Amino acid sequence: MNIALIAHDKKKSDMIQFAIAYRDILADHTLYATGTTGLRVKEATGLPIHRFQSGPLGGDQQIGALIADNAMDLVLFFRDPLTAQPHEPDVSALIRLCDVYTIPLATNMGTAEILVRNLNKGTFDFRDVAKNGGTNETT
């Protein structure tokens, strides 16, 4: 599965803690991240991560493009709800794309934990169905 990791500045430490805690599960998947988040997670975990631009410089939109191409399976976006973001329209667009394309989205550590644990159990079969044009064939 392709997993996006995004975190606002005040939530980057939460993302790092999360990635360390779930490193073994995340290691089995292809990881993508916005610039600084990806760098910090990679430094803390040693996991390979495809890094895009930072969020304000278009990284959110780059991940959004993968969502629109049905090439992203899960988005972990630790948002800071208490700080205004200069690129809020990009954030809203990314969340909208997750809704449009039925991509699971966690905006906090609690939800991310539920999604990643279920991913580990193999309960994300619906993504295979979506990728295969509505059939449950995985070949």
Curated annotation (Swiss-Prot):
The answer to keyword Amino-acid biosynthesis applying to this record is no
| Residue ranges of every copy of the MGS-like domain listed in the record | 1-139
Q: Name one GO molecular function term.
A: methylglyoxal synthase activity
Keywords of this protein's UniProt record, alphabetized? Lyase
Return the protein name: Methylglyoxal synthase
What biological-process GO terms show up in the record? methylglyoxal biosynthetic process
List the HAMAP family: Methylglyoxal_synth
Keyword hit for Lyase? yes
PANTHER family this protein is in?
METHYLGLYOXAL SYNTHASE
Its biological purpose is as follows: Catalyzes the formation of methylglyoxal from dihydroxyacetone phosphate.
Q: Which organism is it from?
A: Bacillus pumilus (strain SAFR-032)
One cellular component (GO) term of this entry: cytosol
- SMART domains named in the record: MGS
EC nos: 4.2.3.3
**Cleaved signal peptide residues:** none
The regions listed as transmembrane in this protein's record are: none
